[in-house]
Swiss-Prot record:
GO annotation (BP), single: regulation of division septum assembly
InterPro entries found in the cross-reference section: MinE, MinE_sf
Keyword Lipoprotein included in the entry's annotation: no
Metal-binding listed as a keyword: no
Family as reported in the entry's similarity comment: Belongs to the MinE family.
Taxonomic superkingdom: Bacteria
Name used for this protein in its record: Cell division topological specificity factor
Sequence intervals crossing the membrane: none
Species the sequence originates in: Baumannia cicadellinicola subsp. Homalodisca coagulata
Pfam families named in the record: MinE (PF03776)
Length: 93
């Protein structure tokens, strides 16, 4: 009887553990998918400012917002410089 209880109780614990892990994964995924309303406008404004000083296209600018621990936001802006594109094209030819 103890063997019977051991086998069936373990399955419930494993299922509960898997359920909790899945809930954590889903919550993290949802947290990262939330895009603030101002982010597209921020990208547009940054592009306009950068275009004053360099020949930048929208594809050369990447803006991402990452949330950490619920109270810390990290804004990451990546800009590919036109000179870098020209150097890569010359090296690939």
């Amino acid at each position: 009887m103890a063997l019977f209880n051991f086998l069936f109780s373990r399955k419930r614990n494993t299922a509960n553990l898997a359920k909790e892990r899945l809930q954590i994964i889903i919550a993290k995924k949802r947290q990262n998918e939330i895009i603030p309303d101002y982010l597209p406008q921020l990208k547009y404004d940054l592009l306009q400012v950068l275009c004053k000083y360099a020949s930048i296209t929208p594809e050369m600018l990447s803006v991402q917002l990452e949330m950490k621990n619920g109270d810390i936001s990290i804004l990451e802006v990546q800009v590919i410089r036109p000179e870098m594109l020209d150097n890569n094209r010359l090296n690939n030819e």
